[in-house]
Amino acid sequence: MWFSWNNTEQSIAVRQGYQVLAEYQLIEQEQLKNIYVIPSYASALHWFGVIFIHSGFYAGSMFRFSIILPDNFPNGTSLPTIIFTTTCYHPHIRPQTQSLDLAPFFTGWRKDHYHVWHLLKYIQAIFADPEGSISATVTPSGDRVCLEEAYNMDALAMLSNDRVAFIKKVQELALFTKKHMYDKPTSNDPHYIVIEPFCSERHTKIMEQLKSPSWKEATSMDTSPPAQCLARIDSSRQMDEEEAKQSAKLFAKNGKAAAALQ
């Protein structure tokens, strides 16, 4: 009996691993810019993430975050947990825990409707249009009616009543994130995203490897096991890329991020 139960548990874990891999492949298909995630080596349910912001109130910021998927993911209705490991000042981020409020868009998880890339677009949306993210409704005259409650009430009040002070505060944090961009990794997980200054010598070497026939042959084999590699980002190049100004609001008039995420 124990042997049968153990095999069942193992098969569930394997199936879940393939489902998580499928989520990662969907993210690649979306081709999201300036936001990067990867499942940790230790657990497929714990993802490392980083977002670079080039425009708006948070321009120049770099925030790290973790995505914790529920144990029964993608089944059930429990929402994933998103924790920022870089200090963020935002109405939807709880100051004590740095956890992100998903309620403005997600009422519950539905595997046939939501994917991890929806979470990433939501993260992008709240930083791209923080004012839109706190709008509960819009009056016929076009005035926004702000939410009455949020994870960070201080940030909500400041953004609603003193826009200049809010921008000043988040820009101070942006400078802080730049200063600590190259700090040593806080995790020894092989998949932890490491950010290093752009190195032309390393870049050239990698490009030559990609052109190599032996490299193409090795990476095209479907049976190859996943490599234990350290994810790296050449941040100088990423930070120099300027995003085009958004042509439409990321939030629907009801204050929810539906327009940005569908």
Curated annotation (Swiss-Prot):
Looking up PROSITE patterns in the UniProt record yields: UBC_2
Q: What is this protein called?
A: Protein crossbronx-like
Q: Which residues form the UBC core domain?
A: 15-179
Q: Which SUPFAM superfamilies match?
A: UBC-like (SSF54495)
Q: Could you tell me which species this protein originates from?
A: Drosophila persimilis
- One matching Pfam family: UQ_con
Please, which domain of life does this record's source organism belong to? Answer: Eukaryota
Q: Which Gene3D superfamilies match?
A: Ubiquitin Conjugating Enzyme
InterPro entries per record: UBQ-conjugat_E2_core, UBQ-conjugating_enzyme/RWD
The family note in this entry says: Belongs to the ubiquitin-conjugating enzyme family. FTS subfamily.
